[in-house]
Amino acid sequence: MLGNFGIAIIKFIAAMITGSAAMQSEGIHSMVDTGNQVLLLFGLKQSRKPASEEFPFGHGKEIYFWSFNVAILIFAVGAGVSIYEGVHSLLHRNDISHGEVNYLVNYTVLAIAMVLEGIAWALALKAFRREKGDSGYFEAVHRGKDPTNFVVLFEDSAAMIGLFVAFIGIFLQQVTGNAVYDSIASIIIGLLLGATSAWLAYETKSLLIGESANRKVVQGIRKIVASVTQVNHVNEVLTVHMGPEYILVNLSVDFKDASKTTDIERTIATLDNRIKAAYPEVKRIFIEAEARLPRRTSHTDNEVVSES
């Protein structure tokens, strides 16, 4: 975080010296990254608050809320300012004296930033690969439940692409003597931030609303329930992520007609223990005892609830 802030300051100083709109946008980009990390750290801290009477399921969704804010506020603001800087520079490019542009300053700052951002990107990619397992990249992002993993990777990827765009824009300006390329680079960086913002908002929105657990987890829970002797049929397995490591489960189960109340109670305890042992991220389980029906038309059946 401090590294990004330091890079942002250096980029802004370079932009003041050289008059480069692309470098100005890169400074904004690094400042955006810094604010991004501050909000994500705050969200992680808030999400670890314990459950209370007011928030019985805890604060796990705080991380989803702040990740969504990162996408909407920071990236969107960064995109808007970068595009504005590029358009402004494009319209007033004759005000810049090309003889005063110190390209060595720009290239030095970009080289340092590329090395530092490259290291951060490699670490983020390594962590993301470890988390995604055998899933593809897009599938892992779409089905991922911890936004901090893919937000950081997206942020660092956008930063690397932005640096290359800035380099190309400044290089073309140096070769041609036309400042329009530097201005266009600034606009492209803004569009890159905007695209990143839209994609992150799309992915975090569904988490904020409430996504189900991954298909393998749901199928695994169904198999555990179906394997218990007293269970005649598993009607429904409903899950929702209350946080990256917090799954709430609601089961609709048809117990065998001959089952006694004590048998059902023991079965519920067994299910609770087995499911939580297999999937530690499952924190709360609610079980409804319902007869098997062709279509579920009512929620007025008797309910037996298991909580922990």
Question: Each predicted region: which residue ranges?
Answer:
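Alpha-helical transmembrane cores and adjacent cytosolic helix/loop segments
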Residues: 1-212
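Peripheral (non-transmembrane) domains and long loops of multi-pass membrane proteins
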Residues: 200-308
